Amino acid sequence: MYCPFCRHPDSRVVDSRVSDDGSSIRRRRQCPQCERRFTTVETTSLTVIKRSGIGEPFSRGKVINGVRKACQGRPVSEDDLAVLAQEVEENIRASGAAEIEAHEVGLAILGPLQKLDKIAYLRFASVYQAFESLDDFEHAIEILRHEADLDGSAESAKKQVRP
């Protein structure tokens, strides 16, 4: 790696640490020529392939901006959105793919958003899945109710098992 100060083509790694979220490695380097230290951050690349076929780097900011409109007027904080974007990125990276279709990013948003806020989920899903009628909304609401019933049944069963 070139030294940013003297452009010497070599450097020595002095220290390496994994970032807090585990998505990157921070390295302290020292140039053997000028002996100055600098920091580099290494991440794996994740490319989103848009409908047009053009690829662009994955952006948590784009995920947050896309979900923010669905969350307007809801009790969802900026921190909640940041956590959601991180969860979406982690889920996508866990698939092991270096490239992912934009459509798949939208699908990866739906699960964490549903856990965060059901109304925001319905708003996002209505646009993302192109709801065309009231029946589409009713169907999505029925699925949410069914899942809530299943979750409630599981919680009841846990409470009954405990002495």
UniProtKB/Swiss-Prot annotation:
Q: How is the cofactor bound?
A: Binds 1 zinc ion.
Q: Which GO terms fall under molecular function for this chain's record?
A: ATP binding; DNA binding; zinc ion binding
Highest taxon of source: Bacteria
Q: Which residues form the ATP-cone domain?
A: 46-136
Keywords, A to Z, come to: ATP-binding, DNA-binding, Metal-binding, Nucleotide-binding, Repressor, Transcription, Transcription regulation, Zinc, Zinc-finger
In terms of Pfam families, this protein maps to: ATP-cone, Zn_ribbon_NrdR
Indicate the segments annotated as coiled coil, or none if absent: none
- InterPro entries, per database record: ATP-cone_dom, NrdR-like_N, RNR_NrdR-like
Cofactor(s) required for function per UniProt:
Zn(2+)
Query: Which residue stretches are annotated zinc finger (unnamed)?
Result: 3-34
Q: What's one GO BP annotation on this UniProt entry?
A: negative regulation of DNA-templated transcription
Q: Tell me, in a sentence or two, what this protein's role is.
A: Negatively regulates transcription of bacterial ribonucleotide reductase nrd genes and operons by binding to NrdR-boxes.
Checking PANTHER family in the record gives: TRANSCRIPTIONAL REPRESSOR NRDR
| Family, as annotated | Belongs to the NrdR family.
What is the protein name stated in its UniProt record? Transcriptional repressor NrdR
